[in-house]
Amino acid sequence: MGLSEDIALFELNLNELIIKYEQYFLGLEKREPLKLLEEVERYVRKYHGAHISNTMLKFKFNSVVARFSSYKQYWNRITRLIE
């Protein structure tokens, strides 16, 4: 798979992860979606240090990573409040 397909899958998995966490916080899901979280983090680690020469793909990747980081901070904060 190429970089553009990986970024598209990364974004799709992130959107699914957002939905799963909202369901978890509402009580519809019994467990935190840790497996999907690991899968999304794997995309971040895979391309974190890699050189992306296409500026459009670099911008897209960085914006999805920034979105993931802000959601992850939010999820950690809410999870700590629940505990």
Segments from the language model and where they lie:
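Terminal low-complexity "docking" segments
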Residues: 1-34, 55
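Eukaryotic low-complexity, intrinsically disordered regulatory regions enriched for acidic, serine-
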Residues: 28-79, 83
